[in-house]
Design a protein with these regions (language model features):
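Extracytoplasmic beta-strand/coil segments of soluble accessory domains associated
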Residues: 74-116, 139
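Outer membrane beta-barrel strand-and-loop segments of large Gram-negative receptors
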Residues: 334-342, 388-393, 399-401, 480-484, ...
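Short acidic/polar hinge/loop motifs at secondary-structure boundaries
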Residues: 96, 113-145
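N-terminal periplasmic accessory domains that precede
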Residues: 73-76, 93-96, 108-110, 128-131, ...
C-alpha cells in the first residue's frame, strides 16, 4: 500500500488538491454551531454513522436535489467525485463509477436491487437512470464508490447507488411540485415536469399508506445527437402494517413507463454510413416499461433484528419503426428473496443472511439474415434484415454472506466479510473484503481496505440459444456458455476530516485491477447459419484503474459556504485482444468515457431564512470512446474535448409551505463539439436554459 500511495503524490495537481481540502480546518475552528452526524445504511447493510462507514460513501440529500433539475439519476449525482456520465449519446446516458461502465453499478431503491437492462439489447443506456422515484419521494441518495460484492454480489463491482425513499408517516402530509425548462435556443426542446407525494395513517398506529408519482416531458431537439422526444411517467403505492411496536409488514407496488421518439433530420441523422453502405434512417419510438412489487417484514427480536423481502420486477421493451411495431418485445422478469439479520455480540456486530435470484428472459433470437435491396431517390441500397424466433431462458443463483464489524475501541473499527455466490451456469464464487477505520482524534480519521468483486455475465451472453443482431443487422453475436465472471481486486485508502461545524474534507486514493473483462469481437468469419458477420463473447479484457477523489464542504460563516469536488482517474487497457473497428489494438488507451480530470465547485449563499442562491462551475476533461463497432475503419477511436459549464440558481421561500426555485443552467452555452460519427464527438450538451420549479408542502 505504501508504494501505491507514493505513486500518486508525484502528481502536483493532486498534492495541491489534498492541501486545499484540509485547509478547511482553519475555517472550521471559527465555527461554533454543531451539526448532527449523517447516518447511512448502504456501506454495512445497517444504520451507522457516516464517519464509521467501511466504504467511500457520499450522500445527496433532498435539499441538494431540489436546487436543479433531477429527473434522472445522472442529474442527481453530478457533483459526486468518482461518478461520471457515460453512454454513446445523450439519449443513452448512464452513470459509471471509478471508470467502470454502468452495468457494473448496482442501483437499489430502499435496499432492493433493480436491473432491467436485459430487456433492452443493442444498447441499454438512457433508461435505468430514469427508473427512479420522483424527487418528492426521495429522502436521500447514498453512493458507495468502489466494490460491494461482499454484501450485494454481482453488479456491485463498480459501486452501489441506493435511493432511500421517505418513510410512511403517522400523520397525513404531502408535497407537490411543478417545473418548466426553457432553452435559449430553439434547436433544443423545452420540457416540463411534475411530481407528488402523499402519506398518512389509514388506521392510527397500525396501517399507513404512501402514494407518490411523477411525469416529465421533453420534445425532440432539432440537432443531430440531441435529445429524443421523451415522455416519462411513474406511480407507486406503499402500505405499512405495524401489528406490534417491534414488527412491520410493508407491501409496495408500482409502474414506470418511459417512451422515446427519434426523427431523421432532427435528433437522428438522415442516414447511417457503415463502410461503403449508406442506409436511410427511419422514424422510430421505444417504449420501455417496468412493473414491480415487494413484500417486506422487519422485526426487532431484542437480541437481534431481521429483514425479509420478496420482490419482483418485470420490464419490457417495444419498438415501433416507421409506424410498424416490431414483433420482437424483449421481457425480463427478476424475482428476488432477501434475508438479512443483524446481531450484536460483545464488541462484534454481525450482519449475515442470504439471497435467491431467479431471472427469466423472453426474447427473439436471430435464425437468419435476409439481404434486401431497394431503390431510394434513384440510388440502390442494400441492407440486412434479421429474422427472429422467440426464445425463453431462465437462470437462478443463490448466495450467503456474513460481515463482522469489530469495535476494538472508540477509535478503531475493523470490518471483515465475505459472500458466496452460486450461479447456475458458472458455479461458486467467493468475494471477501476487509476494511479498517481509525479515528486519530475528534477531527481526523484514516480508513481503507481491500476487496474482491465480480460480475456475472448476462443471460444473453451465457446462452447459446440467443443470437443477437448488431450493426443494424449486418452482424450477429452468439452467447458463450463457457464465459467466466469478470473479477477485480480493489484497494483504497482515505484521509477524512470532519468538524462539528459541518466542515469536512476527504481525500481517497484507489486502485483497481480488472480481469476477465467480457468483450464481443469480430471473428473475421461469416456466421454459417445467417451469413452475417460473426461476433462472439469472450473473457479477454484486462484493465487497471487508479485515481484520487477529493471532496470538501467549507462553511465560511452562517451565510456562506462552498462545496468542492475533484477526481483524477487514470485508466489503461491491458489486452491486445481489445481492438478497434480498424483492427488496431486498443492496449494502452483509457477506458471509454473516463475523463482523466473532472471537477466542480459550488458557492452557496444563504441570504436569510427565505432566500438562498448558488453559483456552480463544473469541468469535465477529454474523453475517448473506442470499441470494435464504433466509428469507421479510418479511426482507432473517437474523442470528445473537455469543457466547462457554469450555473446559477436561487430559492425563495414564500412561507414554510411554498417555495420557488429558479436557475440559469450552462450560462456560457457550452454544447460541446459537433457530433461526428466518423471519429469525433458523440453527443452534445444541453445549451443555455432557464429552469423554474414551484414546491408546495402540506
Amino acid at each position: 500500500m505504501g508504494l501505491f500511495m507514493k505513486s500518486y503524490m508525484k502528481f502536483s495537481p493532486i498534492s495541491l488538491a489534498i492541501f486545499s481540502a484540509f485547509s478547511t480546518q482553519v475555517l472550521a475552528e471559527e465555527m461554533n454551531s454543531e451539526t448532527l452526524a449523517p447516518i447511512v445504511v448502504t456501506a454495512a447493510g445497517t444504520s451507522q454513522d457516516l464517519k464509521d462507514a467501511p466504504a467511500s460513501i457520499s450522500i445527496v440529500n433532498q435539499e441538494q436535489l431540489k436546487q436543479h433539475p433531477a429527473n434522472r439519476l445522472e442529474e442527481a449525482l453530478q457533483d459526486i467525485p468518482g461518478v461520471n456520465v457515460s453512454g454513446s449519446n445523450v439519449n443513452k446516458s448512464d452513470i459509471s463509477i471509478r471508470g467502470l461502465p454502468a452495468d457494473y453499478t448496482l442501483i437499489m431503491v430502499d435496499g432492493r436491487r433493480q436491473n432491467t437492462r436485459e430487456s433492452r439489447p443493442n444498447g441499454n443506456g438512457g433508461f435505468e437512470g430514469a427508473f427512479i422515484p420522483p424527487l418528492n419521494a426521495i429522502e436521500r441518495i447514498e453512493v458507495v464508490r468502489g466494490p460491494m460484492s461482499s454484501l450485494y454480489g454481482s453488479d456491485a463491482m463498480g459501486g452501489v447507488v441506493n435511493i432511500i425513499t421517505k418513510n410512511v408517516t403517522k400523520a397525513w402530509t404531502g408535497s407537490a411540485s411543478v417545473g418548466f425548462t426553457a432553452h435559449d435556443k430553439s434547436t433544443f426542446g423545452n420540457g416540463h415536469h411534475g411530481n407528488f407525494f402523499v402519506s398518512g395513517p389509514l388506521v392510527q398506529d397500525k396501517l399507513d399508506l404512501q402514494v407518490y408519482g411523477g411525469a416529465d416531458y421533453r420534445p425532440e431537439d432539432d440537432i443531430i445527437g440531441g435529445s429524443n422526444r421523451n415522455k416519462n411517467r411513474n406511480i407507486n403505492a406503499k402500505l405499512s402494517f405495524t401489528p406490534t411496536d417491534k414488527q412491520t409488514f410493508i407491501l409496495e407496488g408500482g409502474r414506470h413507463l418511459l417512451e422515446k421518439y427519434e426523427t431523421p433530420g432532427k435528433s437522428l441523422a438522415l442516414t447511417t454510413t457503415r463502410g461503403t453502405s449508406v442506409a436511410q434512417n427511419q422514424p422510430s419510438s421505444t417504449r420501455a416499461s417496468r412493473n414491480h412489487w415487494s413484500l417486506t417484514h422487519q422485526a426487532d427480536w431484542d437480541v437481534m433484528s431481521s429483514e425479509l423481502s420478496l420482490y419482483q420486477e418485470k420490464a419490457k421493451r417495444e419498438v415501433t419503426t416507421n409506424g410498424v411495431m416490431d414483433s420482437r418485445k424483449p421481457e425480463i422478469t427478476n424475482t428476488v428473496f432477501d434475508a438479512k439479520f443483524m446481531l450484536p455480540v460483545a464488541n462484534h456486530f454481525f450482519v449475515f443472511g442470504g439471497q435467491y435470484q431467479n431471472a427469466k428472459l423472453e426474447d427473439d433470437s436471430v435464425i437468419k439474415v435476409n439481404r434486401v435491396t431497394r431503390t431510394v431517390n434513384g440510388r440502390t441500397q442494400t441492407r440486412s434484415v434479421p429474422i427472429y424466433q422467440n426464445t425463453e431462458n431462465k437462470v437462478h443463483q443463490y448466495a450467503f454472506f456474513v460481515e463482522d464489524e469489530i469495535n476494538f475501541s472508540d477509535k478503531f473499527l475493523l470490518t471483515l466479510g465475505t459472500r458466496l455466490d452460486h450461479h447456475q451456469k458458472f458455479g461458486t464464487h467467493w468475494n471477501p473484503r476487509a476494511y479498517a477505520v481509525y479515528h486519530i482524534n475528534d477531527n481526523f480519521s484514516v480508513k481503507g481496505g481491500i476487496a474482491k468483486a465480480f460480475r456475472a455475465p448476462s443471460i444473453r451472453e451465457l446462452s447459446e440459444s440467443y443470437v443477437t443482431a448488431t450493426e443494424a443487422g449486418a452482424g450477429v453475436i452468439y452467447g458463450n456458455p463457457n464465459l467466466k465472471p469478470e473479477t477485480s481486486v480493489n484497494e483504497e485508502v482515505s484521509v477524512v476530516y470532519h468538524h462539528d461545524s459541518g466542515a469536512n474534507a476527504t481525500v481517497t486514493l484507489f486502485n483497481t485491477d480488472f480481469k476477465n473483462k467480457l468483450t464481443s469481437h469480430y471473428t473475421g468469419n461469416p456466421d454459417p447459419l445467417t451469413g452475417a458477420k460473426l461476433y462472439e463473447y469472450s473473457n479477454v479484457g484486462r484493465a487497471n484503474i487508479k485515481g484520487v477523489e477529493v471532496s470538501s464542504h467549507i462553511p465560511f460563516n452562517e451565510h456562506w459556504n462552498v462545496d468542492l469536488s475533484y477526481t483524477y482517474q487514470h485508466s489503461k487497457r491491458k489486452s491486445d485482444e481489445d481492438i478497434s473497428a480498424s483492427g488496431v489494438s486498443l492496449r494502452g488507451l483509457p477506458l471509454d468515457n473516463t475523463p482523466k480530470h473532472s471537477a466542480s465547485g459550488k458557492l452557496n449563499w444563504i441570504v436569510n431564512d427565505s432566500l438562498s442562491a448558488y453559483t456552480r462551475v463544473a469541468y469535465k476533461g477529454k474523453q475517448i470512446w473506442a470499441n470494435p463497432r464504433n466509428g469507421d475503419n479510418r479511426n482507432t477511436y473517437r474523442t470528445r474535448g473537455g469543457y466547462t459549464t457554469v450555473d446559477f440558481g436561487t430559492t425563495y421561500k414564500f412561507n414554510p409551505n411554498v417555495s420557488l426555485n429558479f436557475a440559469v443552467l450552462n450560462i456560457g452555452n457550452e454544447i460541446g463539439e459537433r457530433v461526428d460519427t466518423n471519429g469525433g464527438s458523440w453527443t452534445v450538451e444541453d445549451g443555455r436554459r432557464f429552469w423554474t420549479n414551484l414546491n408546495i408542502t402540506f
